[in-house]
Amino acid sequence: MPSGQAFAATAVITPLADTYITQQFPDGNNAGATELICGAQGGMAGNARNRPLFKFDPADSIPQGAKITGVRFTIVITKAPPAGIDSRFGLRRVLRDWNVTQTTWKLRLAPSVAWGAQGGAAGTDYSNAISASALISDEGPYVYDSTAALVADVQSWLDDPATNFGWILISDQESQAFSARRLASANHGTDLPALEVDYTLPVLPLIESPHLEQGLFSLQFDTEAGYCYAVEFRDSVGTGPWTTLTNVCAKLVPEKVLAKDPDPVSSRVSRFYRVSATGPAR
């Protein structure tokens, strides 16, 4: 991409892992299930609650330093009861780690790391706030439209993968029989859950006006609002680590930045500089 030209793209991401935990079989692990269950099934299962878990890896598809601008989450309901109760299925950000081959209604990590409460505890295991919700009724696809919270979740996972514990899906009528629906999992073969992520990369900074004055080298470059930049140098063109000269964040408006190297030119044989966008400003 040429300097000065912005870049926008959309990535479609399928789950890195998904499963569901069920109150009906509190010690059971459902890794590899082709369908996930959300809500209470009724019948012989009674009012036992079911909660799917999803984990996506945006860093595998989206470059570091990207700014997330939109997120849409799609699920496909594969089975609905004939007289089912409609409800809103809410996505909540998970706050603690879980393992797809170990997690159960009781445990998030085997053999003994429990959820804060069985099935997960709001405020401890998952967020009190709902990142997005959709009214679920009949079979078919459902799209969770982009919200500020969905964007913030995915941006956080991209910037700091160590915070990525995914989402839990909870029906707002999960205590009511026949609120449950089955949905295709990552193992379904078709109709997989999907995360559609819009993102932009900052305008590549163009170094302008390299200048030598009183034995000191300086350079200028234009920033884009909402991004941070690093000015770095090293004394060999091909080898050795880059050293940070300065970091700049332009949070509100674009601006022209002057970066000056305090080391006199006379103290070295050569020096090479680069300017890079390091990510969205916070």
Locate predicted features.
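Sec-dependent, cleavable N-terminal signal peptides
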Residues: 1-9, 281-282
